[in-house]
Regions:
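Non-catalytic substrate-recognition and accessory regions of acyl/acetyltransferase enzymes
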Residues: 1-98, 102, 106-125, 129, ...
């Protein structure tokens, strides 16, 4: 394939250029790409998925109750709800702003709700870059914040020492946890 660049995120470009292979080798995530039919060497978009879950018992009562409203009593006893994590998603620079990102998200959601899917999952999960455009993109595609505030989100995750320092300074997180119910 021709070299891929999303043009605005060197970390993302580097991931798909070099790290995606190691992620697959160590079963940390699986990357896929969409290519042009008329030119299969031209990559339109790339994404990486892996299994994940959300610990519902760690959530506040209002969020937990909202997520549980459609679950049966038997399901409520689960401490974790399985999901598919969209770990990375990027559209090639020349195709940006044309709806391809939304098409990829729609594809991923549909891929995991068909009867012959390989992984049971109730949720699509993303740890989205804490950027206004990125967060708005996921909201437009049906995702909601797992936590209303970053402070609540800091409490949910296991903080590294650097994140603990940010939390103490009330600094923003670099990412925000979001989810979409696939039912």
């Amino acid at each position: 394939c021709e070299p891929f660049t999303c043009g605005n995120d060197e970390d993302m470009d580097e991931f798909f250029r070099t790290d995606a292979i190691a992620y697959a080798k160590f079963r940390m995530g699986k990357s896929y790409c969409f290519r042009l039919t008329q030119n299969p060497k031209k990559i339109v978009a790339c994404f990486t998925v892996s299994n994940d879950s959300i610990r519902l018992y760690d959530l506040g009562s209002s969020k937990k109750n909202k997520m549980w409203k459609d679950f049966s009593n038997r399901e409520k006893r689960l401490s974790r709800y399985p999901g598919i994590l969209i770990g990375r998603l990027a559209v090639a620079k020349e195709f940006a702003g044309q709806g391809f990102g939304s098409e990829v998200v729609r594809f991923i959601k549909e891929w995991f709700v068909v009867e012959d899917n390989k992984s049971g999952c109730r949720l699509a999960i993303v740890d989205a870059k804490n950027d206004v455009k990125v967060l708005a993109f996921y909201e437009r595609n049906g995702f909601s914040y797992l936590f209303q505030t970053e402070r609540d989100e800091f409490r949910y995750i296991n903080l590294s020492k650097s994140e603990q320092a940010l939390f103490a300074q009330n600094s923003p997180r670099s990412t925000r946890l979001m989810y979409c119910d696939l039912l």
